[in-house]
């Protein structure tokens, strides 16, 4: 079941997020709360009353200190930015990530590109393949994390 996040979910989200490092950046509960306040969409996926995945989406009006978000702010006047999609390891490849994205794609946010980034270094080939299967293409690459990471900046270009 997909539902809006609540502050009572933060501990589960922190665990899911920490378990997914280095494919996502570390964030603490105060950052989760800030993202929650600014998000256009922040939902969790529950399986048998356990939060097993989440999706955070911001729009161009967010105040977010991220090189990747800043890249899209410079490129587009309006856009949606997928800050992160995280699925618990034991629930991956079961359609949960696809369900979260389908939920996002069916909402009407007007004619805005949907954007995200995926790590190239450290490599995350499963996420690249997943995003390509959801209609995303790489439009650029950039170094982040003081040059320790390289990301593919992606945009969704087709309806699935």
Segment roles from a protein language model:
Residues 108-120:
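Conserved GNAT acetyl-CoA-binding A-motif
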Residues 83-92, 119-121:
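A short, internal acetyl-CoA/4′-phosphopantetheine-binding micro-motif in the GNAT/acyltransferase core
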Residues 56-84:
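Conserved acyl-donor/pantetheine-binding loop and adjacent beta-alpha core of acyl/acetyltransferases
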Residues 40-59:
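Conserved beta-hairpin
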Residues 121-140:
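Conserved active-site alpha-helix within GNAT-family acetyltransferase domains
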Residues 87, 93-106, 133:
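Conserved acetyl-CoA-binding loop-helix of GNAT-fold acetyltransferases
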